[in-house]
Amino acid sequence: MREEIRKYADEAFEIVTQAADEIGPRLPGSDNERKFHEVMKDKMNGLGLKVKQEKFLVAPRASIGGIPYAGWVGIAGAIMLNFTQLYWLAAIMLTAMWVWLVCSVFLYKTWFDWCFHHEVSYNTYGELTPEDGEYDYTIMLSGHTDTSWNWKHSAIKSKLNPAFAFIKVGLGAVCVIVTTALAWTLAISQYVDYITWMFVAEAYPIVCPFLVAGSFLVTLWLDKNEKTASPGAMDNATGIALAYIVTKYFKENPDKMPKRCRIIDLNCGAEEAGLRGSIAFVRKHKGEDILKNCYNLNLDSIADEDYFEVVRGDAWQGTKFDPELIKMFEESMKEAGIEKPGNIVNPVGGCDSTPFHKAGVRTVTFAAQDPVMTNYYHTFYDTPDRFSVETVGTGLDVILRVIDKIAAVEDGKRNETPVETPAETPEETPAEVHAEAPAEAV
């Protein structure tokens, strides 16, 4: 970390500590999420930014927050298959659950949000413009204010590998899949294949307890208790703090502000509910100036000093982020002294870059997080005492270097644009004037 930015790194870490220790868990649409928005809005106003806050409705349990529902549906379906009259109902119910699970939890579609309870969340953003108000492009620094429910299977303090959580949930998922397959087998075979139906129906009471027990593991994936939810020091108070601090850095150092550039500090709500804040933002501002010639640098979880990485896409969402920005981050991480900068595809879920990418905005996500399962990711143990101000400062260093590279690209574009000048009128020679003058009357 460069010494000139140390005081900014210290302030960023103070914001992280305030968010995690004083405000605490900030579930999507919760009062604490709103408190954090108000804290950051006050800070933006204190810088003299042009601040706006936009409300939107969110169904916290319609996406990842609703995973336990899949387990309960699996349990209900497994029990219903003990009764011939309920075969078809169980099959249809389980299939409907899978349609919702794939669309809402895996693909982050909003199609079924109307089926769930809603809360109010917010997007808060502040604009820093050049002194003359003239700009050609926008650099938008985004992060999410909310935190995740506590993932009970991985929230362990023992030496047991937290990846065991995936084994437990995987076993549960297999049980729900088997229950669904048996439901359709029993429903159809009772009419077309009596022997198969008799065999499965007689064996089912033996299998049923195992299916119920396995499905129960899925219900334990998230703890709905807000008090035990993640305090979100890493994920994502770090991103929010750094987005603000970068903006403050340029406000206090106008000589280092990129020329003809607008800086926006965007605090997205409800990311943990399926990217609902960033989705709401790009939908609201579709076709508007704020998304034109815009570079979105999404900052998410910058805490693990050995795992600085640029996220080049979301596998489940089928998105690939801007290659030019990816290259800039790779170069900037090396310049900042990071020995092994990472370049990864987000293997599960999604990040706020995805809605921006789908809206046609150049975007990439920057992180410093161990990409494998840990006992602090989305758990009660995501606290600020786990990482250092040095790591946050290194992240700040990288971001500032990337912004310098973006500015260089935009400056180059302006210099390449030819300036049209009016054609000069050639001066007339005395001979031409004499020749064109009318003859005087005698």
Region roles according to the model:
Residues R2-I5, I23-D31, F112, A155, ...:
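Second-shell loop/turn segments in exported
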Residues M1-N32, H37-V51, A62-G66, L128, ...:
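N-terminal hydrophobic or amphipathic helices/low-complexity stretches enriched
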Residues P25, N32, K55, D304-V419:
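Active-site-adjacent substrate-binding region
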Residues A90, L94-Y125, E134, T147-K152, ...:
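Acidic/histidine-rich catalytic neighborhood of metal-dependent amide-processing enzymes
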Residues G66-N82, K168-A187:
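Canonical alpha-helical transmembrane segments of integral membrane proteins
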Residues A423-V442:
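Long, low-complexity, intrinsically disordered segments
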Residues K35, K43-G46, K50-A62, Y69, ...:
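Acidic/His- and Gly-rich active-site-bordering loop/insert found
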Residues G66-L107:
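Core alpha-helical transmembrane segments of integral membrane proteins
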